[in-house]
A protein has these predicted regions:
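Conserved core of the sugar-phosphate nucleotidyltransferase
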Residues: 137-215, 219, 224
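Phosphate- and divalent-cation-binding pockets in alpha/beta enzyme and binding domains
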Residues: 84-85, 139, 237, 269
């Protein structure tokens, strides 16, 4: 069943999760040389505002890719104290292709809790959901936008290993999407054991938290309980939507990499990969 009201609606909205605490970004790393501005922002842990190619914040590139995919309304889910994020996009930057709203996630209670904070922004519309610390290829965002219903972008593991900036040991532990015979998501396997991975068909398709949702996801977010680590996880909400609400998530399989901004070691590699990309907000 396709989410109500989402069968033929064009997607113009995206929710960007920007509430992260940045614990690993704050951690000093003597092997990484940062400039003064990068060091200043890294100490605060605001990954999205780390200056990269051309001195522009990483989030500028994430938002520009959404605009390239014809998204024109974005909601940043932020912490109450993230005034710098709100100030940049409300006052410091001229927005030509995007309008940007904000939703406050009062406490860091997980990705489903963050998505729920944006319910007023979403209303009855379908929407994309992405992380603020990942740069997704425009092809993935466009493919999700063009679906007729809910969906997930999954990324080929071998391509991620060869072309992403993410360390191989991290990629090998990433969640894997299981796809049924109809081309829809059946389940997300979080941190699957090697013996389990060995039984799965190749190639492996990784979930990088890049979704198209219908408003039905908010009901799923309300129904789930906390995970073992005490957070409300969007993957749990998706599984509930599949199992109990009969939502179908079409799988969009992408053979391009995702870049990840987690620690200071990621800054130089991302800056090199984003050099030459034009940002237009």
């Amino acid at each position: 069943m396709v989410g109500e009201g989402d069968q033929h609606m064009a997607v113009g909205k995206a929710v960007v999760l920007a509430r992260g605490l940045g614990t690993r970004m704050r951690k000093a790393d003597a092997s990484v040389v940062l400039n003064e501005e990068q060091e200043k922002v890294a100490q605060k842990g605001i990954k999205a505002l780390i200056p990269v190619a051309g001195g522009r914040p990483f989030l500028d590139y994430v938002l520009s890719a959404l605009a390239d995919a014809e998204i024109d309304k974005v909601c940043l889910v932020v912490a109450p104290e993230h005034e710098e994020l709100r100030s940049r996009y409300s006052r410091e930057v001229r927005l030509e292709r995007l309008s940007i709203s904000y939703a406050i996630q009062e406490r860091p209670l997980g990705t489903a809790n963050a998505v729920a904070a944006a319910e007023e922004f979403v209303g009855t519309d379908p929407f994309l959901m992405v992380n603020s610390d990942n740069y997704y290829p425009c092809e993935a965002l466009t493919a999700l936008r063009e679906l007729t219903g809910a969906g997930v972008a999954l990324f080929e593991q071998n391509v991620m290993l060869a072309e992403s900036n993410i360390a191989a040991e991290r990629i090998l532990s990433f969640a894997v999407g299981l796809i049924n015979g109809e081309g829809c998501l059946e389940r997300i396997l979080e941190k699957p054991a090697q013996d389990v991975l060995a039984t799965l068909p190749r190639p492996l398709w990784l979930s990088m938290n890049c979704w198209r949702f219908s408003p039905m996801i908010f009901e799923a977010c309300r129904r789930i309980g906390p995970s073992p680590r005490g957070e409300y996880e969007i993957t749990d909400a998706v599984q509930l939507a599949i199992d109990q609400l009969h939502e179908r998530f079409q799988a969009v399989c992408i053979a391009k990499p995702v870049y990840d901004m987690t620690s200071r070691a990621d800054i130089p590699s991302i800056a090199a990969r984003l050099a030459g990309i034009q940002v237009r907000l």
